[in-house]
Amino acid sequence: RMVNQNRNVFSACMVACGDAQAMVTGLTRGFRVSFDEVTRAIGPATSATVMGLTTIHARERTVIIADTLVHEIPTPAQLADIAQQSAEAARRTGLEPRVAFVSFSNFGSPPMPSGERVAEAVSILDKRGVSFEYDGDMSADVALDHELMKRLYPFARLSGAANVLVMPNL
């Protein structure tokens, strides 16, 4: 009955069964309702951190923003997982991921709790030996403007403007 009467549950089941590659929702229901319906129907993958991705396409540029929907204050391990899963999502859409952990501070200046969590997340990714570029913490303007990044922070690891932004808190 739940599958037949709820379009989110029906769509989620189609994705889970391989009859659809993705689902789009939210026009008539808010995020929390949609999220609860989908996770109740199919649940998260056991090896994944549940998160939300927002994709913006503008001016011949694509930027993925994570996680702006699920984790209010993610732990460093969750931030590392979110970065890794976001990079995988970027690759699936044809982007070569350049991940920036966005914050109010830039590389620990001024010192902030979110910056400390980001520094630990970067350390976790270093230990994992992931195959994508990542750096942070940095402000959004620095992350999205590679010339500014290189001028102000020549030690930054990213080879271009970030195309994946990971938020350390909502």
Q: At which residue positions do the language-model features occur?
A:
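Anion-binding alpha/beta catalytic cores of soluble intermediary-metabolism enzymes, centered on
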Residues: 1-159, 163-170
